[in-house]
Design a protein with these regions (language model features):
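Positively charged n-region of N-terminal signal peptides that target proteins for export
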Residues: 1-4
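Sec-dependent N-terminal signal peptides
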Residues: 6-10
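C-terminal motif of bacterial Sec signal peptides marking the signal peptidase cleavage site
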Residues: 14-16
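An exposed, glycine/acidic-rich loop-and-rim segment of catalytic or binding clefts
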Residues: 18-379
Length: 379
């Protein structure tokens, strides 16, 4: 097992970028490994730097979080395009937004009142968000230390054993998660999970992106496309009603590109419920489990683009509506209202409580799998 420090990442960038190396290297304000080194619950925590020669990512095994992600704009200038914190204690003490850069689960998104039933057994998980369960409860999979299984220059594999009854969920759940920076400038996330008891699983990834760079302005001019003809509408508590709502003629129709801010202020009950965009899009796809591109984002000032591909059936789009500038990110800039977006591939929220939604039940003889790919390029 080999850990790659900042100096090695810079060297790799020099090798990969030729004449642009000095500009690229000097532009990267990488986080310091020593600011992320600790022992928590008897496990070592550290910071790992990955690179494919063009993009560079830093990951901590506390919560399996992406701390920074550097990509070039159309002129080759590098920016860190994800929100994060500069020190481990910001994550451990939950100072600010809890889910920055994290995998979320066991069940991503919301469970109505934190209640569900399996084979006649009723379960209650923590109501950690306005009377409902959000992203796995009080600890989830983001407030624990993952074990490092494998590290390479461009990839890291983390594993987690979530015990039976943890946060109220049944079954011993074993999760393997791999982050890879591919030669095609993709950030690929893969999950595999198994259980020894019938349970529910719906994992997702929760990086907050700003293609201008962290703290560099609003995402309302980012241009978004989503391959989806329906959303799952919610009540005022952001719990799905169980229906599908066609996007035709609504602010939720992103089948053709639209600036995020173009219709975000429309007089629509769903936008009011979420304070902006914060809902689940049902993806237009064949039910064959293949990985396909389902969304794209374009930032016109820098030319940065991000495609999202997945094998999942749905995606949550959140437009950073609840940030208020109270807390600063990695570089001292306030994390402000609508200065980031999340695109979270998943199955439908609260699926366990809606018979018509795709199943999130995992049995002992099954393997849960999930692929999400964020691809970066410019135009």
């Amino acid at each position: 097992m080999r850990k790659i420090f900042c100096a090695l990442a810079a060297a790799a960038l020099m090798a990969g970028c030729g004449g642009e190396a000095s500009k690229t290297e000097s532009a990267l304000q990488l986080m310091k490994a020593e600011d992320f080194q600790a022992t928590i619950d008897g496990k070592k925590v550290d910071l790992y730097t990955l690179t494919n020669g063009t993009i560079t990512m830093q990951v901590t095994n506390f919560g399996g979080r992406v701390v920074s992600l550097w990509t070039p704009d159309r002129e080759g200038n590098m920016e860190d395009i994800v929100l994060g914190y500069d020190k481990l204690d910001r994550y451990v003490n939950n100072t600010g937004e809890r889910f920055l850069g994290a995998p979320v689960g066991r069940v991503a998104n919301r469970i109505n009142e934190g209640k569900f039933e399996l084979d006649g057994v009723k379960y209650q998980v923590p109501q950690n968000s306005n009377g409902h369960a959000l992203h796995g409860g009080n600890k989830g999979i983001d407030m624990v230390v993952w074990d490092v299984d494998y590290v390479a220059d461009n990839a890291i594999t983390l594993v987690l054993h979530s015990k039976d009854g943890e946060d109220g969920f049944p079954g011993n759940l074993d999760i393997k998660m791999t982050y890879t920076l591919t030669d095609e400038n993709e950030f690929e996330v893969t999950y595999h999970a198994t259980t020894d008891k019938k349970t529910i699983v719906n994992l997702s990834h929760h990086s907050f992106f700003n293609l201008l760079g962290e703290g560099n302005g609003s995402i309302t001019d980012h241009v978004l496309t989503i391959k989806s003809s329906n959303i799952t509408p919610t009540d005022a508590g952001l719990i799905p009603t169980g229906e599908l709502q066609p996007v035709d003629g609504t602010p939720f129709d992103f089948r053709e590109p639209h600036a995020i801010g173009e219709r975000i202020g429309a007089d629509d009950v769903q936008l009011k419920n979420g304070g902006g965009y914060d809902m689940n899009w049902v993806l237009d796809r064949e039910d064959n489990g293949q990985v396909m591109t389902i969304a794209s984002v374009y930032e016109p000032t820098t030319g940065r683009c991000m495609d999202v591909a997945t094998d999942q059936v749905a995606m949550q789009f959140y437009s950073g509506n609840f940030f208020n500038g109270k807390y600063a990110g990695k570089y001292g800039k306030a994390i402000k209202y609508r200065e980031s977006l999340a695109l979270e591939t998943q199955k439908h929220p609260d699926a366990i409580n809606h018979d018509g939604f795709p199943s999130i039940v995992l049995n002992p003889d099954e393997v849960y799998t999930h692929v999400c790919i964020y691809k970066f390029y410019t135009k």
